[in-house]
Amino acid sequence: MARLTEREARRQQQQHPPQQQQPRACPMSGPEPPAQQSDSMKDLDAIKLFVGQIPRNLEEKDLKPLFEQFGKIYELTVLKDRYTGMHKGCAFLTYCARDSAIKAQTALHEQKTLPGMARPIQVKPADSESRGGDRKLFVGMLSKQQSEEEVTSMFQAFGSIEECSVLRGPDGSSKGCAFVKFSSHAEAQAAIQALHGSQTMPGASSSLVVKFADTDKERTLRRMQQMVGQLGIFTPSLALPISPYSAYAQALMQQQTTVLSTSHGSYLSPSVAFPSCHIQQIGAVNLNGLPAAPITPASGLHSPPVIGTAAVPGLVAPLTNGFPGLVPFPSSHPALDTIYTNSIVPYPAQSPALTVESLHPSFTGVQQYSAIYPTAALTPVTHSTPQPPPILQQREGPEGCNLFIYHLPQEFGDNELTQMFLPFGNIISSKVFMDRATNQSKCFGFVSFDNPSSAQTAIQAMNGFQIGMKRLKVQLKRPKDTTQPY
């Protein structure tokens, strides 16, 4: 189910700007008579607010009394579908004064629930405005003797400073870095341009670092990357910027991650190939700590004999003949003679021969596979070879493989939930539950793995994992005979 985000709402508003907005006067957007329009001026640093969780039967004139108690309103626009004209349950609000916006956010954000709504109203700066992350600077390579007052004096020439804090260890000693928050984005940008790399502080190993502080999402992604690295898991969806990502690419990446995992943790299939549009080169990939699972041939292909990692100098080889879009990898595949002499006996031909027509539709047009295996390498396998289950078709995993996740961020959807738990194993399904009336996330969901060990690894790593101001609650979903899943 589609959800409206602040960024999408802002994009639609830019495509269809309000008809009655005037550049500097302070009118009310909407069907208000001219007598009620104000002649006040908008502050240069006025904040544009995003307002969510609004009943769909309320228009601008109905919302005005709620917001004008905090100050004069410059613009109030309810977002509507560009094609159907239907109310989307959110709006943009701009006050004439910056202080009015701050007061409204403090008094209303998640503090008041409007009639007919299940969740409290959301009032926060829109993405296009000066959010806290756009005004907050990270300052590194400071002298460990510098105090908050000295850091403040260094930056106060560029504007009004709202906060300044030096990061300190448990013993109270400075870590040589600080956070400085200005009152506007322009002031913070000016400080970056003037001070970044401008000097080397006493005792610092390199020049001064001044940059915008990371947002909550960036910090969360970085922590997840670090956690994945500690577990020894390689997950391209976390290691590379993948947005926007198609559903097919996610499913393919998930399947290829499963191919890399085996029941013994020491074998891999050389037939793995990653989409060149997302990964240009892959060096060595550490397989230590990969979740244990039976090897799954990619996209329905029967796997040739598995190969010990000691005999494989390169992880993968290019399918240049069958996949013209793939970029060759730096390592070459070992000769088949070498493979077959490593105490590995070829599969006997007891099953029907593999034909091109039986391949996955994604591999339509593949004419030959001699880039990796000659004809002998495609010898059919025995009937005892386990066949992989269909990817992303089963709604729930076996007993002990289904997780309940609570305290999810409001903006998280099915894709974000999948990417968060993909490092721990093969995901059968993932779902964030939505409110049918408001089309907003209920902030909880479910993830189903194909084996219990992956589920337990995910619980140990992600239960209590902090995202923003919330800590995830991750536990096994109760059996179906219980009335509640948690």
UniProtKB/Swiss-Prot annotation:
Chief location category: nucleus
Biased composition annotated in UniProt, kind: Basic and acidic residues: 1-11
PROSITE patterns from the UniProt entry: RRM
Localization per Swiss-Prot or TrEMBL: Nucleus; Cytoplasm
Keywords: Cytoplasm, mRNA processing, Nucleus, Repeat, RNA-binding
CDD domains attached to this UniProt entry: RRM1_CELF3_4_5_6, RRM2_CELF3_4_5_6, RRM3_CELF3_4_5_6
Family membership noted in the UniProt record: Belongs to the CELF/BRUNOL family.
Protein name per UniProt: CUGBP Elav-like family member 5
Species, as recorded: Xenopus tropicalis (Western clawed frog)
Primary gene name: celf5
